[in-house]
UniProtKB/Swiss-Prot annotation:
Chain's gene name: GPP2
Organism (species): Arabidopsis thaliana
InterPro entries: Gpp1/Gpp2-like (IPR045228), HAD-like_sf (IPR036412), HAD-SF_hydro_IA (IPR006439), HAD_sf (IPR023214), PGP-like_dom2 (IPR023198)
First and last residue of the signal peptide: none
Protein's name in the database: (DL)-glycerol-3-phosphatase 2
Similarity remark: Belongs to the HAD-like hydrolase superfamily. DOG/GPP family.
Tissue spec: Ubiquitous with highest expression in siliques. Mainly restricted to the meristem of immature flower and vascular elements of the root, shoot, leave, siliqua and developing embryo (at the protein level).
Catalytic function, reaction form: sn-glycerol 1-phosphate + H2O = glycerol + phosphate; sn-glycerol 3-phosphate + H2O = glycerol + phosphate
Length: 240
């Protein structure tokens, strides 16, 4: 599913690409879901995707506040205590992170074609290192990485801070926002990219409410389905 008019408008103008990470390049969102389901089960509550959608892409403390308030457990568990409890479980899961389908192919393709690429993620440095430790060679192809604990990121998504910081750090930056293509899976991330004035391709989890998807310029079900030439980028040279 895509917006043909938006894709046509962006054709030929993209010079730089920014990737989100969790749920887009790495299959880590399942870890958050698993741990949060365990925590809520103690309070006889269930973790649903409407709540997850509100948390995705945000800074940890912001997501934690949403979690305890929206689930109705804030009187029993503070956002800070939730993060401490969640952290102990996630530490063991993050090093097992797997790449999402199509991620390696797209990153390597853009790198070989000399398209500057980077990451803008809400993940803090300590978690970034754990999540990427099995894939360091691939992630080393990024020109730079902007993380959630970066001093220039005053506000998390949907604020544009992370994406604007990422655009500034490219060689000869800042890059014109209209020439940047962002890949995101989270509703808050899509809004952040649009708030930064950038083009955005959304690769949502199929369980996300479709109402969250009308802001993106293009929607695809997997990075495998992305056609670079639709955005004026060099086409893939293989048929996989």
């Amino acid at each position: 599913m895509s917006n043909p008019a938006a894709v046509t408008a962006g054709r030929g103008s993209i010079t730089h690409v920014i990737f989100d990470m969790d749920g887009l390049l790495l299959d880590t969102e399942k870890f958050y879901t698993e741990v949060q389901e365990i925590i809520l089960a103690r309070f006889n509550k269930k973790f649903d995707w409407s709540l997850k959608a509100k948390m995705m892409g945000r800074k940890a403390i912001e997501a934690a506040r949403i979690f305890v308030e929206e689930s109705g457990i804030s009187d029993s568990l503070s956002a800070e205590d939730f993060l401490v409890e969640r952290e102990s479980m996630l530490q063991d899961l993050f090093p097992t992170s797997e790449l999402m389908p199509g991620a390696s192919r797209l990153i390597k393709h853009l790198h070989v074609k000399n398209i500057p690429i980077c990451i803008a993620t809400g993940t803090h440095t300590r978690h970034y290192d754990l999540k990427t430790q099995r894939h360091r060679e691939l992630f080393s192809l990024m020109h730079h990485v902007v993380r959630g604990d970066d001093p220039e990121v005053k506000q998390g998504k949907p604020a544009p801070d992370g994406f604007l910081a990422a655009a500034r750090r490219f060689k000869d930056g800042p890059v014109d926002s209209q020439k940047v293509l962002v890949f995101e899976d989270a509703p808050s991330g899509v809004l952040a990219a649009k708030n930064a004035g950038m083009n955005v391709v959304m690769v949502p989890d199929p369980r996300l409410d479709i109402s969250h998807q009308d802001v993106a310029d293009q929607i695809i079900t997997s990075l495998v389905d992305f056609k670079p030439e639709e955005w004026g980028l060099p086409p893939f040279e293989d048929s996989n």
